[in-house]
Amino acid sequence: MLHEMGLLIFLAVASTGQQNLETQIGSNYCDGSLWKRVYKPQRLQKLQPSCITVTGTIGKSQTEKDGNFYVQLKLDPKPVFKKLLNDRNRKAQNGNLILRPVCVQKVTRPDAVAACKNFTPKLRIPDEGTRVMVTGTYVQDNARNHGWREIHPVTSILPIP
């Protein structure tokens, strides 16, 4: 029985005719409960694979009024990571993937308060220049004047020694 299941899984994967992007970037567990903490989630379009793990170096970061951090991540130079960026990332975000850890700062935008109410995040944002491994939901932010791709919400950020 186990052998037959393994064969079926193998055939299903092999029949696609291409290697799955999800397996190339080593996707892990994404915490779905964090979506309750996303301000205006309708602006975010989940992409495939929806849960990804990437590596790169922390760049510019700043706090946002919705309580989120905005972090630019310079992805490691792996060919598969280049596919994660679009033109808006290249032009408006200096070629970086955006990370959006949710509710990590005080919310100052009145209509965003409810998303972070009674929530204490467990994430620590490493300093600029730190090499990290990041897991979270891969999305495109379709808010006005955005259009770039992000990991939002971020499930984990781990420094790489």
Locations of regions flagged by a protein language model:
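Sec-dependent signal peptide recognition
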Residues: 1-8
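N-terminal secretory targeting signals
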Residues: 10-18
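OB-fold and OB-like single-stranded nucleic-acid-recognition modules
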Residues: 17-161
